[in-house]
């Protein structure tokens, strides 16, 4: 059951927002435990070049070649492009709402690589879950959500992507603080 209520459209500092209602039985560590994963970022949406996924794969693979860490990229959504076959990229396809929220809640961050988004419900859901976001800084709307909320970061090139990912994966204190700010932002 979709928990989005469009009658609750709100104004967040000039940017439209939506009332987000999350299930009460989210288990953020369930996916990690079942898969034996410690750190991961998550992408939720159509896996498509038009959504920035080709660049996401290129940046993530380069990052993994340069860094010695165990971070994984978990994908949820319809696949319309080839996904690199790697142990550190996990595609779940379409998932139940329960699994979606459990996976999102356990992530170090949600990644949104698209340059062309308006109001992203999945970004707001992530913030409501206390999970920071990393967005493509060429998408002005998502970038401004990060700036105003202080619950996310943005990148415009590989070096910024790598730095933001390092921060989210390696700095639990920063993740926790940004997570709290995200919840406050969505609750406004």
Question: Which residues make up each language-model segment?
Answer:
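Short hydrophobic beta-strand element within catalytic cores of glycosyltransferases
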Residues: 132-136
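Aromatic "clamp/platform" in nucleotide-sugar-dependent glycosyltransferases that forms part
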Residues: 115
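A short, well-ordered alpha-helix in the C-terminal region of glycosyltransferases
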Residues: 174-188
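Short alpha-helical segment that forms part of, or immediately flanks, the ligand-binding pocket
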Residues: 101, 119, 124-128, 142-144
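Donor nucleotide-sugar binding/catalytic pocket of nucleotide-sugar-dependent glycosyltransferases
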Residues: 1-26
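Conserved donor-binding/catalytic core segment of Leloir-type glycosyltransferases
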Residues: 34-51, 57-62
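Nucleotide-activated donor-binding/catalytic signature segment of Leloir-type glycosyltransferases, i.e.
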Residues: 77-101, 109
């Amino acid at each position: 059951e979709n928990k989005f209520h469009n009658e609750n459209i709100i104004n967040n500092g000039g940017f439209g927002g939506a009332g987000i209602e999350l299930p009460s039985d989210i288990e953020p560590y369930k996916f990690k435990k079942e898969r034996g994963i410690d750190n991961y970022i998550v992408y939720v949406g159509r896996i498509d070049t038009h959504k920035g996924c080709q660049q996401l794969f290129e940046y993530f693979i380069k990052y993994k070649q340069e860094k010695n860490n165990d971070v994984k990229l978990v994908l949820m959504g319809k696949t319309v492009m080839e996904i690199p076959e790697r142990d550190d990229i996990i595609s779940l396809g379409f998932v139940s709402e329960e699994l979606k929220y459990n996976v999102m809640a356990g992530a170090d961050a949600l990644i949104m690589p698209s340059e062309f988004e308006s109001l992203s419900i999945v970004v707001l859901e992530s913030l409501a879950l206390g999970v920071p976001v990393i967005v493509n800084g060429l998408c002005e709307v998502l970038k401004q959500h990060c700036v105003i909320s202080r619950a996310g970061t943005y990148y415009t090139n590989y070096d910024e992507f790598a730095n933001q990912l390092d921060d989210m994966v390696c700095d639990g204190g920063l993740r926790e603080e940004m997570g709290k700010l995200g919840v406050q932002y969505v609750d406004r």
